[in-house]
Amino acid sequence: MYCKEIDNMKLLEPIKVGPITLKNRIMFPPMTTGYEERDGSISKQSFNFYKRIAEGGVSYIVLGDVAPVNTVSPTPKLFKDEQIPAYKELADALHEFDCKLGIQIFHPEYDVQALAEMFKKGDMQAARAKLHHDMLHFTDEVTPEALNTILKKMGECVRRAYEAGVDVVEVHGDRLVGALCSTVLNHRTDEYGGSFENRTRFALQVVESIKEHAPHICIDYKLPIITDNPLRGKGGLKIDEAVEFAKKLEEAGVNMIHVGQANHTGNLNDTIPAMGTQPYCFMQSYTKRVKDAVSIPVSAVGRIVTPQNGEALIENGVCDIVGYGRSLLADPDYVKKIEDGQPCRIRLCMMCNKGCTDSIQNRKFLSCVLNAENGYEYERTITPADDKKKVVIVGAGPAGLEAARVAAVKGHDVIVYDKDTQVGGQLNIASVPPRKEEMNRAIHYLANEVKVLGVDLRLGKAVTSEDILADQPDEVIVATGASNFILNIPGKDMPHVQDAWKVLSNEQFPAGRIVVIGGGLVGAETAEYLALRGNDVSIVEMMDTIAKEESTTIRPEMMADFEKHGVKQFTNTKVTEITATTVEAETAEGKVSLPCDYVVFAVGARSNAFDMTALEEKNIHVQVVGDANKVADINSAIESGYLAANAL
């Protein structure tokens, strides 16, 4: 089990990296957050986010994608001296926790100045066309003179960082630097193209520029590897060349190397794989090749979830430093809990990518569906209640359990009722479809927390308001969740018509030709689940997209499964009737008749009602949270449970 304590963990040992010493081997690797000001300066939200992670015990934090120019990208920027004080304030704050600050310097693959002029003129069509062109051709078309200008701007950025007290500069070896290194993307015939020496020339010039502008700063280098499947990333080096280049980086004065998956495809699942799409620690074989070739420290990233994952990487000589990215979003106190001998209490990341990766791709700020404080650090905090209360919670799904956890942390006496004999609510079926088993970590965390905190958990008991009154509560939180909705159409009560939730919970077992009515997330997951078991599956959806709510990093995997297993998709299609052998439907083109042995309903959920009359008559304050209030997702469930309980 991940919660088993490990004695004398190497993860907690200090390590010397060039001119600095890290207090432990756990780093927060570069991630785009969307927290910065419009000009890329450090905002209060950004400052609080990084400070909170430092407070949790990590030794090294890297700000991702820091641009030395005013790009259109929503990333941090350090292109003018006026931005230095904010970076200095952040560096000073991290240093209070003995945490080193790094910036990952990068340059995008487009003409920043030309695009800025187009945006200034309001010529959006030309700007979009220019951006699209440059993303495909800038690597080949950028002149040596322009590259020299970029080098100077990078050097000035490094100088500003050093003046701000930044400890480490990490070269982003992907993006423009990685594209120039790549045999896949670089087709140049000048001194920056062709041979290995030429393709890596600019990268080494960046390193030299850092040394020139900040001779005493620690230098990190993100070394992107083009793995066995080059479609997953093109902007970097294949492993044999990467190993040779790592040696050159060490010779050039780089102090550590951060090995990662190359990415130049626009799909963040390449570098930040979602649950079930890549093995844990999926980059370890490539990282070890690099580690074996150099004597400087090497860091590893890539679906590293548990303390045991990281410890094994160090023990097995794969790396010296471990990057926990999404894991620290889920639980910024990850390191403290290891140090305190409480790894069981770590809120482990599910790797769902909904709050983090999807948010960034949708131009929202970074968040975590399991951590309601993420993005609101030092604004949302759990503090002891002024008055101890008895709190009764109805429902032990994610909203109810989170409310119970928070209320207990605040010092209240908490009772939780649930009609089922196990906790977790809908998470128990959400973790069944392909790739979704990792959602069980959320159940494990919440169940363990309420146990540790002494919550009185009363399972297998359906309660009424009158029952609750016997407990003499001061506060009641209703978290009764939702139930699958069966569409009222002719034939819905026939014996071969089933419920997607019951299918996923192994209460019903359709087989043969199956029509799933509803192509939302549950319908699509159920269809995939049934197709992988050898059934002939069709999905009928009224809207124009199947699984629209699925993570953008997972949906391509689902669609690939649909194609592989022959799942037929009918969008913009309305079901009109179910017969003994068919599902009748209508499209804009006319009627469709789908033969079937079974029909499975997955058209959505409806909130479960709870009669609060008796409680209201006694003037007991009642809050309704999660799907019981409004059907949504786990993010909404956790957040509403947190906020309701924290207000007590």
Question: PLM features: residue spans?
Answer:
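Flavin-dependent oxidoreductase catalytic cores
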Residues: 2-394, 398, 402-409, 413-414, ...
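Alpha-helix C-terminal capping/helix-to-coil transition sites in glycosyltransferase folds
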Residues: 23, 318, 470-472, 595
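Generic structural signal for residues in well-ordered beta-strands
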Residues: 219, 298, 457-459, 497, ...
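Short beta-alpha connecting loops at secondary-structure transitions
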Residues: 270-276, 320, 427-435, 542-547, ...
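Rossmann-like dinucleotide/flavin-binding elements
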Residues: 386-417, 458-466, 480-493, 501-552, ...
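Rossmann-like dinucleotide-binding cores of NAD(P)H-dependent redox enzymes
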Residues: 416-453, 529-573
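Feature captures the FAD/FMN-dependent oxidoreductase FAD-binding
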Residues: 444-485, 576-582
